[in-house]
Amino acid sequence: MPVDFLTSDQKQNYGCYAAEPNDVQLARYFHLDERDLAFINQRRGKHNRLGIALQLTTARFLGTFLTDLTQVLPGVQHFVAVQLNIHRPEVLSRYAERDTTLREHTALIKEYYGYHEFGDFPWSFRLKRLLYTRAWLSNERPGLMFDFATAWLLQNKVLLPGATTLVRLISEIRERANQRLWKKLAALPNKWQAAQVMELLVIPEGQRVSALEQLKKGPVTVSGPAFNEALERYIRLRSLEFSRLNFSGLPAIQLRNLARYAGMASVKYIARMPQQRKLAVLTAFVKAQEITALDDAVDVLDMLILDIIREAKKTGQKKRLRTLKDLDQAALLLARACALLLDDNTDVPDLRQVIFKCVPKNRLAESVSKVNELARPQNNNFHDEMVEQYGRVKRFLPAVLRDLHFRAAPAGEHVLAAIHYLAELNGSKKRILDDAPEHIITGPWKRLVYDAEGRIQRAGYSLCLLERLQDALRRRDIWLENSDRWGDPREKLLQGEEWQTQRIPVCRALGHPVDGRKGVQQLAIQLDETWKAVASRFEKNAEVHICNEGKYPSLTISCLEKQEEPPSLLRLNNRIKQLLPPVDLTELLLEIDAQTGFTHEFAHVSESGARAQDLHISLCAVLMAEACNIGLEPLIKHNIPALTRHRLSWVKQNYLRAETLVSANARLVDFQSTLELAGRWGGGEVASADGMRFVTPVKTINSGSNRKYFGSGRGITWYNFVSDQYSGFHGIVVPGTLRDSIFVLEGLLEQQTGLNPVEIMTDTAGSSDIIFGLFWLLGYQFSPRLADAGEAVFWRVNKSANYGVLDKLARGYADLSKAESQWDEMMRTAGSLKLGTIHASELIRSLLKSSRPSGLAQAIMEVGRVNKTLYLLNYIDDEDYRRRILTQLNRGEGRHAVARAICYGQRGEIRKRYREGQEDQLGALGLVTNAVVLWNTLYMEEALSWMRRNGEEIIDEDIARLSPLMHGHINMLGHYTFTLPEDILKGELRALNLNINNELSP
């Protein structure tokens, strides 16, 4: 295993002064208190006192003693000398002229201040134990472990060993942890299971690829045969019975990484591994792939049912168009007959004869029959056409009933009973069903399920069950064991003793009282006071008016006037654009890496110590290939080792994945937050969320249809989150255009940057009562831009309160007693979300899909209505608030424009078939977009500094309105070189573009 994993900076800075300490570091490490001065003043001569003081403070700061104190930086020498009343630090040259003096002083410091040698017991043992725990539980890069070890040694007053000693120790510990993991995994399968997984590496007779390669490939189309194939894949994995093995005690992240590695590595490479490691890798793969295969199969089933419904609607609409002429004729004939019935001049005794004389009886009967045949009930959802597809359903329904082991919550028990009933009839050709559970047969289905004699028809019953099954699956009333995406979300909430232990800390962290009555009282008081405050100011609000023309009063909110850019801002924008130097995107990535070191976050999927020369160049090339959507081919340079086809393919397969992209992106976001200019734009507490649409012209199940965005094809949505500093801190790939509200919380809860956004802006699609409620429970502010804010329902909790001019507007009543009775459950749900035991989208999906909300869902909706009203009242009361929402949403849209410019290849279409590939590619796009934003911010700061130095006038208010979302100076097309000048590699900025006419246009 390679042991030289340190970067050049780590090697250079280990145990040395890298730069002058800042004021905080000087105060913490180099301040001498009375005890220090008493110890130092025991030495004779200024040179000895200054020397031992510098040795002491250096040991505190660096964790080691220096043999040559001239390496101590001048600022440190001066800071320490002043405290000793030594006015000439030059006396230091006389220090330690004898080696004995140096040894004596270091020994005195060690004894007096309690410093230890690295080899002393128990310090070395404690460090090894800590490092082993980290290596076992995580896939942390060895470079980070090195930094952790250095910090731990410094904190515990253990003198640093040589860098190679620490590197070798970390490498040995990592190897031991890996060997232990492989040993434990390899010991789990029995002999039969071990033999079966080894057979996966063999190419079956008559086939071209191994069984392992076949199992790697998930479904890409939606059809009955595709579902059957996906289910067979799951059954094959399930038959190995790995779900019965005990994987507890094994680190989940390590298992995921091993499984991903097996999914990407070639079969030949796995076959050449040592037996123990090979079995461990295959065991991790089978365990993870069984869950994935089940999820994929149910995904296809869900989309297949949706396709049947969509096809039925399409067929029904075509039928409707073809029969409209006949229906119109029959309706007109019946209208003539009814007109005679309504005519008061028609003699009642002769009514039938009069009607039949005008409209012949046989034609009237034909018209009645035609209307009954062609007219559709109001609640009909093309169920007739669904039943017509029973022949298609018969091809996959038996497999659903036989091979998927469903479980049910109480609300899904009737559906589960129907599933079990039909499962018992598998293989039977009975068309009429006896004693079938009838609770699932509701509304319009009754006409299609029951025949004229009241008997249950199998075709109608099967289609009815299929529709109910999909609904129950989406609500998680029906769920599957050993499934990630279709499992029971309730099991992932904090349970029993664990919740009781976390209950009080969770409530405190979220800012809610433990007592539900107190919590709802506070909320009710807040709403009442806000109503009264806004009502008292409403007469002075010229932008909002009450409209009483409709059934209920509503509000008319004037559109925000465009905020004109003053001439000074236009000049400043123009000047900065002129000063920004032109740059290739390739160089930009390398330059940002030199500034931030973001490529250090990319670790090998299974051998996280594996590095290669100029790896950062290879990583930047792969990131550009993915972000620009051009593939590796244009970037391959056979004469440059870092850009060969083999190197780039190796890097793409082993380094580019979700967790490394997230870590690298976090480094860029955190660096952006340290810049003064970014601080002028915002503090990182505000963010917006919006979707960016991409067409997917390839066959994939991870896409959806939406004619507005994807035409006649299918596509995906990249739902991403942008801070008020213009940095993108999270992104989610969504099939098609699912409701934004399902994912809006996930970006706040799962983002891993140093930002702490507490308020998020979205468009109308991200809004619902439950979302408002969950945001409040978690301590966040939800601020959507509602297209129909004036028409929205405003809620009150005090029925008798009078809110003056706004009183009639408060027509909804929020029943907070529901929230009080469910308070503990709401806190448990919020705590589970905050602690990450359940994904926000998984919980929200189950809450939103329910047509019969549970008590918990109703409680969240009630507090959501109150908080929605609080938001609406502030929205109509404060024009600055409305403008702030609009400004932040515009930032997100502007960032999308930059991302579109970067992702120019293949017409901007995403051609990855599987979810993981789509996530990796769009993660790379987000990373490169952040790199562009960061580069622009750095050079905008430099341009502003240059303008100040040259006496140009800059108005502070204009700086806050600048934007780093420009890209005209960045070349993204056709020129791919990965070289930088030496000074820029060291972190210097390139020269501004000063070869311009300094005269600005008026």
Curated annotation (Swiss-Prot):
One of its GO terms (biological process) is DNA transposition. One of its GO terms (molecular function) is transposase activity. The keyword DNA-binding applies. Keywords: DNA recombination, DNA-binding, Plasmid, Transposable element, Transposition. Pfam families: DDE_Tnp_Tn3 (PF01526), DUF4158 (PF13700). The keyword NAD does not apply. InterPro entries: DUF4158 (IPR025296), Tn3-like_transpos (IPR047653), Tn3_Tnp_DDE_dom (IPR002513). Disulfide bonds: none annotated. Required for transposition of transposon Tn1000. Belongs to the transposase 7 family. This is Transposase for transposon gamma-delta. It comes from Escherichia coli (strain K12).
